[in-house]
Amino acid sequence: MMNEKQRLQYTAQIETDHPTDKKSALDENLQRLKQKTSQDYEKYFSTVFVPPSLKEAKKRGKEEVKYHKDFSIPEEFRGMGNGRKFYIRTYGCQMNEHDTEVMAGIFMALGYEPTDRPEDANVILLNTCAIRENAENKVFGEIGHLKPLKQNNPDLLLGVCGCMSQEESVVNKILKQFQYVDMIFGTHNIHRLPYILKEAYMSKEMVVEVWSKEGDVIENLPKVRKGNIKAWVNIMYGCDKFCTYCIVPYTRGKERSRRPEDIIQEVRHLAAQGYKEITLLGQNVNAYGKDFTDMKYGLGDLMDELRKIDIPRIRFTTSHPRDFDDRLIEVLAKGGNLVEHIHLPVQSGSSEVLKMMARKYTREQYLELVRKIKEAIPGVALTTDIIVGFPNETDEQFEETLSLYREVEFDSAFTFIYSPREGTPAAKMVDNVPMEVKKERLQRLNALVNEISAKKMKEYEGQVVEVLVEGESKNNPDVLAGYTRKNKLVNFVGPKSAIGQLVNVRITEAKTWTLNGEMVEETIEVK
């Protein structure tokens, strides 16, 4: 990843380090970039790109899901990347992180080498997130910062991919304001990367490929995973819930599940490679299997099979309360390698606000689900997502969110101020909660989140917990860091040989968000 200091350094270097004999090459490149505006992009979009439409998107459920299991790099593309390097900057969720692993796998299969320095790259991709406006602004800022690098190197390919690429307004902005971008491709087009690269090398125009059949599942894509301790495994793609504030159903497409045999095979392969923890991924992971027409098979059934595989820990994210059924609770209660941590976004504690959000459950239904989970899985760690300042949210409705948080006693929460997303139903609502009120509500909510987290963490003092050691602490290389089954970060002093292993740690100090401890050698019952 490139931090602000590094960005400024290489931008300054680009602007000052070039001798005058390069001026003609720079001018020639700028002229080439300007020529890109000649194409009639408005006409292009009117014929091949369909903007987000709630009415049209909801019709897509009838489309058959097709499975393609024969992905391979065509011979004509092999060696394309010989002598070239790639750099991918990733924004957003674990799905994007996993998509980056797939793109890195494709790049390396083409012969490219990875680099963590954008100035050394021949291809730069920004894998983007569209969940909030702030995330998009960061990407536009990054595209601007990369302009000097692009001007200096006419052969550099600069691409924007991921969720932002699926939004017409974003693509139009790039076409009009950032003509030096060479490629724009969407979340459904990752498997087309070799073809997109080839066209970008050969074309003088921007390559835009954001439309495709979204009802397919592509198997056997190459991956370059980060590390060899924890791995992500996609089990489904897309979302059909259409919460009024959310852009994901438009950027990620319809819900479509991978076949269980393909998932089981992938997890077995990871277990054989020595991975210690698997996280099953999906925009709405517990809707898994609802699109199958040939069998009744859900996330609970899949987890029941995966728990028999010899891998220490299995997690999943993100779940929707609406699809969290009794079968899944029953299987999770079996324990073993199924961890006692569930991320269960509530978004609001008010039934009225939940109705405006189209979450399709009430406060009471959510609390009943929590009761069943806690009864079946004693000591379970529940975490959540909460939005404050949704249109028309009153003070009383916000108080309901605070009271629900106190009642559930979540271990932690991701909290956000409402951000309207163009193309969603909520964007048409009047955003009538003043920003100062939103900020005050967020501050009050975060104070409660911190208070309960500190209280729950304090209970760990004196306990011995199982920790999967991931590496050195970011703040101190002499300290090791890892996570418990309930996803608590633990820092402790121990030998480097413990990295990648499951060890027992006695907690000596609890902080609001982290635990400090000491490694114990003796066999002891852990929490």
Curated annotation (Swiss-Prot):
Signal peptide boundaries: none
UniProt entry tagged with the keyword Transport: no
Cofactor note: Binds 2 [4Fe-4S] clusters. One cluster is coordinated with 3 cysteines and an exchangeable S-adenosyl-L-methionine.
GO molecular function, one term: 4 iron, 4 sulfur cluster binding
Keywords annotated in UniProt: 4Fe-4S, Cytoplasm, Iron, Iron-sulfur, Metal-binding, S-adenosyl-L-methionine, Transferase, tRNA processing
Basic and acidic residues: bias regions: 15-27
Necessary cofactors: [4Fe-4S] cluster
Residues reported to bind [4Fe-4S] cluster 1: C93, C129, C163
EC assignment: 2.8.4.3
Reaction catalysed by this enzyme: N(6)-dimethylallyladenosine(37) in tRNA + (sulfur carrier)-SH + AH2 + 2 S-adenosyl-L-methionine = 2-methylsulfanyl-N(6)-dimethylallyladenosine(37) in tRNA + (sulfur carrier)-H + 5'-deoxyadenosine + L-methionine + A + S-adenosyl-L-homocysteine + 2 H(+)
Residue ranges annotated for the Radical SAM core domain, each copy included: 225-455
Classification via InterPro entries: Elp3/MiaA/NifB-like_rSAM, Methylthiotransferase, Methylthiotransferase_CS, Methylthiotransferase_N, Methylthiotransferase_N_sf, MiaB_methiolase, rSAM, rSAM_horseshoe
This protein's GO CC annotations: cytosol
Domain named TRAM: residues: 458-521
All copies of domain MTTase N-terminal, residue ranges: 84-202
Region (Disordered): 1-27
Location in or out of the cell: Cytoplasm
Top-level division of the source organism's lineage: Bacteria
One Pfam family, short name: Radical_SAM
Annotated HAMAP family: tRNA_metthiotr_MiaB
Family the entry assigns: Belongs to the methylthiotransferase family. MiaB subfamily.
Assembly and oligomerization: Monomer.
PANTHER family associated with the record: CDK5 REGULATORY SUBUNIT-ASSOCIATED PROTEIN 1 (PTHR43020), MITOCHONDRIAL TRNA METHYLTHIOTRANSFERASE CDK5RAP1 (PTHR43020:SF2)
Function: Catalyzes the methylthiolation of N6-(dimethylallyl)adenosine (i(6)A), leading to the formation of 2-methylthio-N6-(dimethylallyl)adenosine (ms(2)i(6)A) at position 37 in tRNAs that read codons beginning with uridine.
The protein's name in its UniProt record: tRNA-2-methylthio-N(6)-dimethylallyladenosine synthase
Lineage, top ranks: Bacteria, Bacillati, Bacillota, Bacilli, Bacillales
UniProt gene name: miaB
